[in-house]
Amino acid sequence: MTRSYIPLNSLRAFEAAARHLSFTRAAIELNVTHSAISQHVKSLEQQLNCQLFVRGSRGLMLTTEGESLLPVLNDSFDRMAGMLDRFATKQTQEKLKIGVVGTFAIGCLFPLLSDFKRSYPHIDLHISTHNNRVDPAAEGLDYTIRYGGGAWHDTDAQYLCSALMSPLCSPTLASQIQTPADILKFPLLRSYRRDEWALWMQAAGEAPPSPTHNVMVFDSSVTMLEAAQGGMGVAIAPVRMFTHLLSSERIVQPFLTQIDLGSYWITRLQSRPETPAMREFSRWLTGVLHK
């Protein structure tokens, strides 16, 4: 369908009716009659050659086609409304401050940012990185991307992606590792969690490392993988965040066994109101990750 044939009034009527699941409430919101909403929806259904609503025992319901169309319109109208508001207040740039755990920033977010800037040029994005210990209120952050179980005090958290952990090491060390037990011939590199290696060894069917085993602790998986590339030992880290190193063969994943100790989440303090820019960023990021 070309732009000249896009039925904007019918789409507005459908979006309001679908959001409220009521033609009456949609008519009140748009300041038109119930009959006008009904006619616009009927016209849109004829143009799309499909039914968008059905009437059930509990009232108006969306069809599968209606459910597919609604989020697209929600996003489009939100973006248009947000831009018009910014022009009206002479603020064409909306600032957005994000704190991102370094591993996710390098392994996932940074490669995607050019797409975000193309799609949302009106958002002035400020990014700071952290090592999963962060104070969003003190730092004035709109969103914080964290690793963990999804529960933080007075915080809303939305799931982004998994962070399955597995051993990673240099090709030189990998050539000397035939079984999981062979990993214990080398220093073990880990983050602040003491039980990572014990849990992975258990999943691989091996005994945990000795309490006296040579272990190096890092506050960032990024610096830990730098050490692993240099042959300083075998790291345990979220594989998904280091696909760029795996594809270039700078590091190797010697075994497919993985453990689930946490995931990545986008979080917001409940005391912080959600702005249009925040909603746009969250919707964009979850969209690209969940494709």
Swiss-Prot record:
Domain of life according to the entry: Bacteria
InterPro entries tied to this protein: LysR_subst-bd, Tscrpt_reg_HTH_LysR, WH-like_DNA-bd_sf, WH_DNA-bd_sf
GO cellular component annotations of the record: cytoplasm
Main location as per UniProt: cytoplasm
Keyword Transmembrane applies: no
PROSITE patterns linked to this entry: HTH_LYSR
DNA-binding region as annotated in the record: 23-42
Subcellular location: Cytoplasm
Keywords, ordered alphabetically: Activator, Cytoplasm, DNA-binding, Transcription, Transcription regulation
GO biological process: DNA-templated transcription
Family to which the UniProt record says this protein belongs: Belongs to the LysR transcriptional regulatory family.
Function per UniProt: Regulates the expression of the beta-lactamase gene. Represses cephalosporinase (AmpC) in the presence of beta-lactams and induces it in the absence of them.
Name of the protein in its database record: HTH-type transcriptional activator AmpR
Upper lineage: Bacteria, Pseudomonadati, Pseudomonadota, Gammaproteobacteria, Enterobacterales
Gene name of this polypeptide: ampR
